[in-house]
Amino acid sequence: MITNLSKVSGLFVIARNSSFAFRGKDTDPRAIASELGVRYLLQGSVRRSAGRIRINAQLLEGSTASHVWADRFEGAAEDVFDLQDRLTEYIVGAIEPSVRRAEINRARRKRPESLDAYDLYLRALPHAHANTPSETDKALHLLGRSIELEPDFVAAHGYAAWCYEQRFLRNGLDLSDKAAALRHADIALGVNSDDPQAMSMGAFVRANLTRDYEGALEVLDQALALNHNSALAFGFSALVSAHSERHERAVEHGHKALRLSPLDDPLNYHPYCALALTHFFAGSFAETVSYATLAIRANPGFSIPHAYLVAGHIGLGKPDAARVAARRLLEVSPAFSVGAYERTELFRPPLMDALTAALRTADLPE
């Protein structure tokens, strides 16, 4: 539902995890709207019984908590996507009558024919978002099963590409992982792909593994044209921009990702990492420390922002703080070494040299 609404031009839609932070809580709708910075709230319930699904939904005006629209939808369980499309159409009509039907049609995307494949994909997401070696393996297992059932499911291929890329970079630079990452990325970026999420992941993976930053940014711009409310796409765009020393774009897109998803902790470490890195390359080391700290808070098990924090403290001339951060980095990733990180070749040599020089100053393993 959130994905479909986000694709409609003219709508600013808060991401799933931020929205769901209030689920099950007795919170005044006006307070929720104020915290998220939105004008309307959509709430409702889904019930399933004897092969039927019933969706009750209501739209509230955030400033007054008054009802704008309410309705109930019912259909067969296998028609859940049709119910979502109908709900999208009604809500868009209630919020902005001038939105054209053609834009509602653009919100309808290709989906896997099998709900089983979709369910496996959904179950893989939290493991992928954790971005640790063990969780990445779990995600790849589920994504592999999903793709077996639905070989053309580009969203699953996008996540598989990302997971294989992460495993390649953080688990010994196994060339088979790199090949798998690029293979899935190519499918995610295929000629029939119009899924902004899959496009964003495929572009990010190719940028990291081939350093074709210009091509990746072109694809990311296409993805954002399809879905201008994608926090994930803006986050990946910020990372690619930081990796390629496009400071202004990295800052702009990093903050845009955070604005779209202010409470989305499982994914906010992406824009925070981008902001930490781009500020390091720009010589703004206090900002590096600040954003690296936020990235660690969002995902403590992800090792890379710990490295950025080390580098930021070195840049500020605080070697003692850098050594504390370095010890924490090794607790999270005992196998981390500066040489192995350098061999990932994530950035062009001048940028990588600056970062690894700072890490070496903190006495991290070579």
Language-model features, listed with the residues they occupy:
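Acidic, proline/glycine-rich low-complexity intrinsically disordered segments
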Residues: M1-L316
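TPR/TPR-like (Sel1-like) alpha-helical repeat modules
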Residues: I314-S337
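Terminal, low-structured helical/coil segments at or just beyond the last alpha-helical repeat
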Residues: V338-E366
